[in-house]
UniProtKB/Swiss-Prot annotation:
Function: Component of the A-type ATP synthase that produces ATP from ADP in the presence of a proton gradient across the membrane.
Species name: Methanococcus aeolicus (strain ATCC BAA-1280 / DSM 17508 / OCM 812 / Nankai-3)
Name of the coding gene: atpD
Protein name: A-type ATP synthase subunit D
Keywords recorded for this protein, A-Z: ATP synthesis, Cell membrane, Hydrogen ion transport, Ion transport, Membrane, Transport
HAMAP family associated with the record: ATP_synth_D_arch (MF_00271)
């Protein structure tokens, strides 16, 4: 600490810096805690939606296999190609969670009627239509899951960054400034004592001369 200037002005500046650092530390801790709460809430949502996606896909593949068994694989493929959906629209927006920008995905025109898919109830297994409905539902859920999982990743990164900043302030920056404050206070006390003894010595010499 040899490069520190032990003056009262420096001590005042340091006290102000410590107060600001402590305030920043408190705000960052609040942000960290709020982010963690939000993170776990979204994590719970992801778990539920992931289960829904798996269930929808499982049902869809079962119905597809049954449709292939009834109609034949080639017929199912021909109908699938003919009923291709070119009207799906994906909109991307964003929202802010505690300073973190996360995506908002919106998918439109996914679910269709049998007529929209280009086939009728005759000559087509009901299982194929059920499979189509379930795949459409799964696609909407997959988009919702993608939005949530991306948000989880971004929040986790921000939590790690915020934790590092909290720890840096708590264990490095604030303690270091507190040590500097203590050092300057001690040096000022020493300097005051030295000045006091110096003045006392000067006064004693003056008194001695006057008596002589």
């Amino acid at each position: 600490m040899a490069d520190i200037n032990p003056t009262r002005m420096e001590l005042l500046k340091l006290k102000t810096k410590i107060k600001l650092a402590q305030k920043g530390h408190k705000l960052l801790k609040q942000k960290r805690d709020a982010l963690i709460m939000e993170f776990f809430e979204i994590l719970d949502q992801a778990s539920g939606i992931r289960d829904k996606v798996n269930n929808a896909l499982e049902k869809a593949y079962k119905d597809l296999i049954m449709a292939q068994a009834v109609m034949g694989t080639l017929s199912v493929q021909e109908i699938s190609y003919a009923s291709k959906n070119d009207n799906i629209v994906l909109d991307l927006d964003t929202r802010n969670i505690m300073g973190v920008t996360v995506p908002v995905l919106e998918i439109e025109n996914v679910k269709r009627t049998m007529a929209d898919r280009g086939y009728g109830p005759y000559g087509v297994s009901s299982k194929l239509d059920e499979a189509a409905k379930e795949f459409e539902e799964a696609l909407e859920l997959i988009m919702e899951l993608a939005e949530i999982e991306t948000s989880i990743k971004l929040l986790a990164e921000e939590i790690i960054t915020t934790k590092r900043r909290v720890n840096a302030l708590e264990y490095v920056v604030i303690p270091r400034m507190a040590e500097m404050q203590k050092y300057i206070g001690m040096r000022l006390d020493e300097m005051e004592r030295e000045n006091f003894f110096r003045l006392k010595l000067i006064k004693a010499r003056i008194d001695a001369r006057e008596e002589a």
